[in-house]
């Protein structure tokens, strides 16, 4: 029997809509509860240092009401680690961050920032959080993740999602497959995410080594037309269908 592939729903862009007008709506807290009710296995949110979408208040309230688990994405900075120490998320994913980027542009470079990342991993683990590192599908970065003590990685699927030709997409899919196999051979839990949507998720979901996909923008965009609960259910259905064809 194939292992179930989990879905973490990222609700950042509910907050993006709210912050565009500085209103109190739409409410990320309500979105988190609706996503859970529709079958999300966890809620992912990224409180960026520039506070462009998710605010500290959102994180505090969501932590109080979640029935599943929180995956808090954060930059490797003292301020963000201090905040995590207040929240104590079940899962914490360290990500790279640039103020000028529209969205996360690539994976964390553990090789370059090993000492800083290692200290952050240890600090989060002392808080009781399971730590994940958001990295490119690169074997050297995967080895470095093991070296700094992270038990979980999240493979950056952005290059696959942004591919402009079938050849390029196939190449990037193979990179992700090989990276997932390599990471699993090192006893890492392997998640994936970034840029995944309803038309490209199935090949990724069919990778047997993957434990969880974190998806946000596509689900929130679909929700504008069919509602958030239906958007979450549809994504789960596609992921489950992909797993039916994976050999044990």
Curated annotation (Swiss-Prot):
Pfam families attached to this UniProt entry: PdxJ (PF03740)
Pathway: Cofactor biosynthesis; pyridoxine 5'-phosphate biosynthesis; pyridoxine 5'-phosphate from D-erythrose 4-phosphate: step 5/5
Site (Transition state stabilizer): 154
Oligomer and partners: Homooctamer; tetramer of dimers.
Function (record text): Catalyzes the complicated ring closure reaction between the two acyclic compounds 1-deoxy-D-xylulose-5-phosphate (DXP) and 3-amino-2-oxopropyl phosphate (1-amino-acetone-3-phosphate or AAP) to form pyridoxine 5'-phosphate (PNP) and inorganic phosphate.
NCBIfam families found in the cross-reference section: pdxJ (TIGR00559), PRK05265.1-1 (NF003623), PRK05265.1-3 (NF003625), PRK05265.1-5 (NF003627)
The protein's name: Pyridoxine 5'-phosphate synthase
Species the sequence originates in: Legionella pneumophila (strain Paris)
């Amino acid at each position: 029997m194939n292992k179930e592939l989990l879905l973490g729903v990222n609700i950042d862009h509910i907050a993006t809509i709210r912050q565009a007008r500085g209103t109190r709506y739409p409410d990320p807290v309500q979105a988190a509860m609706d996503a859970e009710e529709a079958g999300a296995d966890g809620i992912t949110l990224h409180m960026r240092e520039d506070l462009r979408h998710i605010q500290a208040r959102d994180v505090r309230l969501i932590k109080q009401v979640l029935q599943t688990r929180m995956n808090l994405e954060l930059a490797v900075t003292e301020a963000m680690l201090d905040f995590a120490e207040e929240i104590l998320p079940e899962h914490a994913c360290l990500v790279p961050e640039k103020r000028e980027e529209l969205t996360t542009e690539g994976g964390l470079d553990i090789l370059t920032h090993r000492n800083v990342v290692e200290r952050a991993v240890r600090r989060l683990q002392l808080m009781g959080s399971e730590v994940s590192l958001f990295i490119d599908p690169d074997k050297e970065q995967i080895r470095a993740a093991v070296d700094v003590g992270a038990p979980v990685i999240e493979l950056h699927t952005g290059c696959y999602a942004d591919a402009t030709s079938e050849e390029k997409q196939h190449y990037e899919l193979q990179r992700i497959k090989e990276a997932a196999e390599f990471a699993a051979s090192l006893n890492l839990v392997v998640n994936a995410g970034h840029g995944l949507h309803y038309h490209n998720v199935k090949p990724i979901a069919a990778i047997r080594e993957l434990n969880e996909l974190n998806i946000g923008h596509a689900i929130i965009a679909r929700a504008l037309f069919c509602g958030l609960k239906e958007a979450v259910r549809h994504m789960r259905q596609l992921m489950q269908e992909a797993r039916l064809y994976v050999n044990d």
